[in-house]
């Protein structure tokens, strides 16, 4: 199976664009106790960095992008980023050169799905360890 590339831009340019993203409005919404999650500034900042790291991993390891897993709060950050569709589309265009679709893993409850999730989790740990020597 051939995996669609997320971008044709040079990796270093995409990573620089990811790091330059202004996600202040995303964090503000997530810090709002009524509209968001009531996160602290410190926690929102840490999840913003984790989100940018996740996007970087997708670009650096495009051949595995469909299998790289993300933490629940990073996924929540991504969902909140997507809510402002115009800004998200703009951010995707300047960062990746195209729209980055969110395709959540669908749970079927089958043994095959559990095995695939387990393999994806192992791959994610391996790639993060390779990248960050953790």
At which residue positions do the language-model features occur?
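Intrinsically disordered, low-complexity, repeat-rich regions
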Residues: 1-134
């Amino acid at each position: 199976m051939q995996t669609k590339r997320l971008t044709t831009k040079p990796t270093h340019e995409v990573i620089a664009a990811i790091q330059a993203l202004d996600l202040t409005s995303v964090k503000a919404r997530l810090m709002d106790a009524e509209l968001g999650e009531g996160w602290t500034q410190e926690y929102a900042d840490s999840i913003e960095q984790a989100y940018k790291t996740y996007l970087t991993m997708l670009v650096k390891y495009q051949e595995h992008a469909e299998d790289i897993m993300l933490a629940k709060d990073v996924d929540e950050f991504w969902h909140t980023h997507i809510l402002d569709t115009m800004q998200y589309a703009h951010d995707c265009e300047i960062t990746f050169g195209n729209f980055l679709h969110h395709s959540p893993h669908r749970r079927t409850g089958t043994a095959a799905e559990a095995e695939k999730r387990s393999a994806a989790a192992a791959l994610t740990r391996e790639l993060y360890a390779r990248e960050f020597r953790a």
